[in-house]
Amino acid sequence: MRLAVLAPLLATASACRLPAAVSPVRPPSSASSIRLPPATTDRTLSPLEAALLLAFRWQTQQQTGVHSDEPGFHGMLSELREYQREHTTQEQADASLRIMASLAGPFPSLFRPFAGEPWAPSALAWCTTKFLGFLVGATRLTQRRAGDPRGGGVLVEKCAVLEHGGCKGLCIHMCKLPTERMFAEQWGMPVHMAPNFETCECQLSFGVVPPPVEEDATLPTGCLGSCPLARDGAPSLDAFRDFT
């Protein structure tokens, strides 16, 4: 029965002629030289995306205890920034993990028995393109990673959270690290997320074990030069300078 449910996903994933994955980019050694341009992407959501954002934001409020009167996507970013100011990077990652786990429901346990199947990375990549747009914007399927023609890759063309949030700490501690941990521990599927802090692209590679964060060449040290929290002198600013 479960395989019958997954059949449309598998057929779609296997039939695609996938473009190559984006190669990881080694950023400047110091993130302070990176200044993101002003956000330009229009956050117009479909009814489904609006409903998903509402559910995500409600869970964010429940797990962080932070509430903003600002509506929609930007209100959610305001809540996450406020939580960052007062909590350690570990607390930020733990809160994000709880948010994602609560929204995933029973699906990780349903998927986990099939995590070792050759089609599993492609199936997760396909699902990601259908259900993640409300949070990050436009996505497209790619090969798993540069030089690997298998399916299982997703390119976030311009991550809305990074573009509008402008914070490396938000990207790493409340998205990249908890997402990689959640898929490995709960779904039984490794995934490597490789953000590009100059273009706001992010390459997801399902079925690829991420390197230790201190060895990840895609992550510069320090705060982005355009980070709003760095400009404001947030109390927890120093925590953003480290990856652990």
What residue spans do the PLM features occupy?
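Low-complexity, intrinsically disordered Gly/Pro/Thr-rich segments
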Residues: 187-191
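Beta-rich nucleic-acid/ligand-interaction surfaces
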Residues: 196-207
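N-terminal chloroplast transit peptides
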Residues: 1-24
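Sterically constrained small-residue positions within well-ordered secondary structures
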Residues: 6-9, 147, 195
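N-terminal accessory segment detector
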Residues: 18-155, 160-173, 181, 192-193, ...
